[in-house]
């Protein structure tokens, strides 16, 4: 059976909460310490854990104690290439290495988008420090030790307020977290707590490794790991890691196995013939930021023989108002057609594949438990193609062929 895990995050997610949940779930501390030494930064930290209590519930608190560094006593800040080099020379298990590199890549891309620089030029501050390296690599080591093949995650709370960062005070969620949520279309909500609940490290772990966000998948629960956060909150500040076996087809009622599902959507449409084409691209980005599931355009002919654009927006009942607001604000339209439809969705998961040029994520679609489509992620292929100065198509084909080579013969 497939071993899976579910990140239940009622008060958010951070790297140390993930580590605590894994240690609480049975991952040996000495195993993590042994492999983390390979990073070559053992003199910078010590790792330990202990039991704490939040709202009457016991959980495990992972502690990454930083050691003094020179006169200023600050852990070193690092660039993305520095982190890649540390991870690649550490001799980690293959999955742990690939996952760690993928998580830091998403962090670099998010920070690059926020600051308007190339990913290689991103100067990590909080997320590039020693404790984040330990949190991310340690989390990947723990998931690999547990034999987790699929990871799922709950919707994430937004938090609120402000937080002190290297560039001054930032609103919560911080820009890098928002960038990750937007890129991966993460479902979020407010639980009324005005604190930083999701850190950049925690967000990157979730979006990179989780194949789906939402309610827990069908599983036979074997163990729960409870990872404590640092803050005292109105709710028990605990991340709950559900560990178990994926439920078999026979164990799940028909239509609830996640192989495919039907959900209600809303289609918004408007025809435009008097808008600067440059504004269309901006509007599409704004619609995705407002929660649109998909946005697309079609060239059409309109009255008086004018060429125009049919702008279509797929959204949910929860985001329809915000999407309509964007359309009225950013375009010249005077009206929007709204229709309720259904869509059928195949189950899918993201797998990170270790190729000779680096890790590449693939999206795998299932129908009735069988694989029906495999596609490498475009952005991963593009990033590797640029780094290696190779054609995108060559990297795309390499990822597919490498994946198929690792599959068992029928």
Swiss-Prot record:
Family indicated by similarity: Belongs to the LarC family.
Highest taxon listed in the record's lineage: Bacteria
Gene Ontology molecular function: lyase activity; nickel cation binding
Organism of provenance: Cyanothece sp. (strain PCC 7425 / ATCC 29141)
Family annotation (NCBIfam families): nickel pincer cofactor biosynthesis protein LarC
UniProt cross-references to InterPro entries, sorted A to Z: Ni_insertion
Protein name: Putative nickel insertion protein
Signal peptide: none
Pfam families: Ni_insertion
Keywords, alphabetical: Nickel
């Amino acid at each position: 059976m497939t071993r899976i895990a579910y990140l239940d995050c009622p008060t958010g997610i951070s790297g140390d909460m993930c580590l605590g949940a894994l240690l609480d779930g049975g991952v040996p501390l000495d195993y993590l310490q042994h492999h983390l030494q390979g990073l070559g930064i053992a003199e910078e930290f010590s790792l330990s854990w202990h039991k704490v209590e939040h709202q009457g519930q016991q959980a495990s608190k992972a502690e990454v104690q930083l050691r003094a560094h020179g006169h200023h006593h600050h852990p070193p800040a690092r660039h993305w290439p520095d982190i890649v080099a540390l991870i690649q020379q550490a001799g980690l298990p293959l999955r742990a290495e690939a996952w760690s590199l993928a998580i830091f890549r998403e962090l670099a891309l998010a920070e690059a988008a926020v600051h308007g620089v190339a990913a290689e030029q991103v100067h990590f501050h909080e997320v590039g420090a020693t404790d984040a390296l330990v949190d991310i690599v340690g989390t990947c080591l723990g998931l690999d030790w547990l034999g987790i093949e699929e990871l799922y995650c709950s919707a994430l709370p937004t938090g609120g307020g402000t937080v002190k960062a290297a560039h001054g005070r930032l609103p919560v969620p911080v820009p890098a977290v928002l960038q990750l949520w937007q890129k991966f279309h993460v479902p979020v909500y407010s639980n009324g707590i005005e604190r930083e609940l999701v850190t950049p490290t925690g967000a990157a772990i979730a979006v990179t490794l989780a194949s789906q966000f939402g309610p827990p998948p069908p599983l036979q629960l074997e163990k729960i790991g409870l990872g404590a956060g640092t803050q005292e909150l109105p709710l028990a500040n605990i991340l709950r890691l559900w560990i178990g076996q994926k439920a078999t087809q026979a164990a799940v009622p028909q239509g609830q196995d996640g192989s495919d599902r039907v959900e209600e959507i809303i289609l918004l449409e408007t025809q435009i013939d008097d808008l600067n084409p440059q504004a269309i691209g901006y509007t599409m980005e704004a619609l995705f930021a407002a929660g649109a599931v998909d946005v697309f355009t079609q060239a059409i002919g309109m009255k008086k023989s004018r060429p125009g654009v049919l702008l279509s927006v797929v959204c949910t009942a929860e985001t329809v108002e915000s999407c309509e607001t964007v359309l009225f604000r950013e375009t010249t339209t005077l009206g929007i057609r709204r229709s309720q439809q259904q869509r059928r969705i195949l189950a899918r998961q993201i797998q990170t594949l270790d190729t000779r040029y680096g890790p590449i994520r693939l999206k795998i679609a299932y129908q009735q438990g069988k694989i029906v489509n495999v596609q490498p992620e475009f952005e991963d292929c593009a990033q590797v193609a640029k780094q290696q100065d190779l054609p995108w198509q060559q990297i795309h084909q390499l990822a597919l062929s490498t994946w198929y080579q690792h599959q068992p013969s029928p």
